[in-house]
Amino acid sequence: MLAEGVTTHTFVQKGIYNMIFESIKKLVTYGLESGLIEESDRVYTTNRLLEALDLEEYDEPAEEFSDVDLESTLKELLDYAVEKGLTENSIVYRDLFDTKLMGLLTPRPSEVDTKFWGLYNHQSAKVATDYFYKLSQDTDYIRRYRVKKDMRWIAPTEYGDLDITINLSKPEKDPKAIAAAKLAKQSGYPKCLLCYENVGYAGRVNSPARQNHRVISLKINGTDWGLQYSPYVYYNEHCILFNKKHTPMVIDRSAFEKLFDFVRQFPHYFIGSNADLPIVGGSILSHEHFQGGHYSFAMAKAPVEEKIVFKGFENVDAGIVKWPMSVIRINSEDKNALV
């Protein structure tokens, strides 16, 4: 028999709150396990999550959690947010909301920069990028549970073993979100998806949320650039190096100087550039950027079929590579000669 003033609805509501409190505790535990937050951040982070979920009270569950599964925990929180009308039930809006939640666990940009360069200067460039790559996954900027759905295999050919990938981690927009994007107010901020102003941006229906996005600030040939990872990971440690100034792609002598300056600082990475041409070139020609990573492609392993000599550059080894498209490989210990 129910006590006076207590209804079945009361028990249902209490059950819902107990479940959401468990999900909040699991997410905070995930932050602690992954090193995103410290023990002294526990109460602060819990309160920030309560605010985001429009909750004014919290009764901490007695159960302790470990090895928290991030995808299922976020799903629990998202389902609650949808039920309470805090967000719409589509992949675009759910992504906007869970990125907001993960942003509450993500260290400040200055903290990430300080940690990165501390590791770089006192240990090595590789230790620094290992830290940053793990952070970019732990914050859910790179969604591991989506990336693992990608299809990858090796195809033996006369040109060597080719890497074939089908990227399935980039979510398809649902019709409702597409319609909403058409009606949404057009904004010039950030100017594009590569701009530094994306760091911490809340996003909107036609622009992804980036509260959990972090960028390493560095100098390339004396100018301000940023280093980030691609959220879609086409290959291992797929990184993007971009000019902090929104300036168009141009392939000229200075572009090659910038590429060499990057590999000087990060010798364990490769770096390359798309063409600065529409359609056949990069997808964002309005913003100067290069792409790199910790990977060896089949073209880099392909043999030279025919050696060639460039007059005046006898200190440069050059040759035509055995490849289905026109490729010339140049190699020298003299960086200036290569440029």
Where do the PLM segments sit?
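Structured alpha-helical segments in the cores of large, soluble enzyme domains
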Residues: W225-P231, A255, L259-V263, V309-V316
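Histidine-centered divalent-metal-coordination microenvironment in nucleic-acid enzymes
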Residues: N236-N243, V280-F297
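Short, Lys/Arg-enriched N-terminal segments with co-localized hydrophobic residues
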Residues: G5-N18
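Helical scaffold of the NTase/Pol beta-like nucleotidyltransferase catalytic core
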Residues: N212-R214, H246-I271
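Conserved His + Asp/Glu catalytic blocks
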Residues: V250, F270-I271, L277-S283, H294-V339
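Hydrophobic faces of well-ordered beta-strands that scaffold small-molecule active sites
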Residues: L227, I271, E288-F290
